[in-house]
Swiss-Prot record:
GO MF, one example: iron ion binding
Name of protein: Cytochrome P450 CYP105Q4
Domain of life: Bacteria
Sequence ranges of Polar residues compositional bias: 1-12
Gene expressing this chain: cyp105Q4
Region of interest (Disordered), ranges: 1-21
Family per record: Belongs to the cytochrome P450 family.
Record-linked PROSITE patterns: CYTOCHROME_P450
Residues binding heme, per UniProt: 108, 302, 304, 361, 363
Length: 414
């Protein structure tokens, strides 16, 4: 796959390349060749996005970690210069209450503290038997059904959806509804009208659920938020926004990682064998870290804006300029990882990947995602050792048009 590292980047008449960029059909797991060409030249550069603005694209591993940790960088998407993902996201920015995803400083700390309880290492470890049971039940159903089977529909999507539904206290029968509304705003060309409609529907649903949990609490995360509302620490709107974010992040990203990860393993059977034969949990854990590094499913950058001048990588990011922190080229940075374009599940230092971000804004649910991936990959390969792709790789429908990369379908046989 090393030929993907030197391809030219698309440029506008001004010489500033457009972003996002297209991936290579010949190597769908690699970051876009144009992005890798920019990264090979320098760790940050200007790019042009959908609205004509030219934020900084950060591709170097060290620079990514540095900016993730820099208090002069803001996640506040209301600030001028913030490089929004699409018109839909921009259109809803002043309609959404603040949340852990868009707050800085003490406000961010307050929100994160309110979300931390269900995602502690202890709570996640206690969930492992439940995740294992859900995984086994869906593999049982897949084995009992016809071939080929769509692994996305049969396993990759329902497992994390069920897990996050149970964790949050959201009825699973509503999963199709929240998946639909969540997906609307994640599309590259989502319109303002579509995004507003989806966001309002999800927010209304979560607000009503928070109010219901205030009257009848249970052992779940939405009930925890409801208790915060009753204590005067959160408004119902804030609690609903936090719950909405967890609901979207808790199933969409993990589902994509399961589907794309299984595909990567199927086209690298020697590496699949490492997971299939693994008895040591440490080997399984490291394999997941390497898959996270190799695939980096948040494919079009974590969005930020500078509120002070920042000198980094030989450039100066001025206050008010947008920043896009691209995880994929950072995780393929040859200065940080030897042979980065190679999937190697025994890789030393794989845990240094930035797939979940870095610093104070790194993913609050990362321990849950790791547990799900460890269980699903190993169980699937051990229970169905003859699992194979039922179509040509070039015929697999990839999510090139989404914020989170993955596959729409994954036909498999055994």
């Amino acid at each position: 796959m090393s030929d993907t590292l030197a391809s030219p980047s698309p440029e506008t008449a001004s010489g500033i390349p457009d972003y996002p960029m297209s991936r290579s059909a010949g190597c769908p797991f690699a970051p876009p060749p144009g992005v890798m060409a920019l990264a090979a030249a320098k760790p940050l550069t200007r790019v042009r996005i959908w609205d004509g603005s030219t934020p900084w694209l950060i591709t170097g591993y060290e620079q990514v970690r540095e900016l993730f940790s820099d208090s002069r960088v803001s996640v506040d998407d209301r600030l001028p210069g913030f490089p929004h993902w699409n018109a839909g996201m921009l259109s809803t920015v002043h309609k959404r209450p603040r949340s852990v995803f868009t707050a800085d400083g003490e406000e961010h700390t307050r929100f994160r503290r309110m979300l931390s309880k269900p995602f502690t290492f202890k709570r996640v470890e206690a969930l492992r038997p439940t995740i294992q049971q859900i995984t086994d039940e869906h593999i049982d159903a897949m084995l009992a059904g016809p071939q080929p089977a769509d692994l996305v529909a049969k396993l990759a999507l329902p497992v994390p959806s069920l897990v996050i539904s149970q964790l949050l206290g959201v009825p699973y029968e509503d999963a199709e509804m929240f998946q639909h509304h969540a997906n609307v705003g994640l599309a590259r060309y989502a319109t303002g009208a579509d995004t507003v409609k989806g966001a309002m529907s999800l927010h209304k649903y979560l607000a009503e659920l928070v109010e219901a949990k205030m009257a009848n609490p249970a052992e779940d995360a939405v009930s925890d938020l409801a208790e915060r509302v009753k204590a005067g620490e959160l408004s119902v709107k804030e609690a609903a926004q936090l719950g909405t974010g967890l609901l979207i992040a808790g199933h969409e990203t993990t589902a994509n990682m399961i589907g794309l990860g299984v595909l990567a393993l199927l086209v690298n059977p020697d590496q699949a064998g490492i997971l299939r034969d693994a008895q040591d949990p440490k080997i399984v854990a490291n394999a997941v870290e390497e898959l996270l590094r190799y695939l980096s499913i948040i494919q079009n950058g974590q969005r930020r804006v500078a509120h002070e001048d920042i000198h980094i990588g030989g450039e100066t990011i001025r206050a008010g300029e947008g920043i896009i922190i691209d995880l994929a080229p950072a995780n393929w940075d040859a200065h940080a990882f030897t042979e980065p374009d190679r999937l190697y599940l025994h890789r030393a230092g794989a845990e240094r990947n930035v797939a979940f971000g870095y610093g104070r804004h790194q993913c609050v649910g990362q321990q849950l995602a790791r547990a799900e991936l460890q269980i699903v990959y190993r169980t699937l390969l051990q229970r169905i050792p003859t699992l194979t792709l039922a179509t040509a790789l070039e015929d697999v429908p990839f999510k090139d048009d989404r914020l989170a990369y993955g596959v729409y379908e994954l036909p498999v046989t055994w």
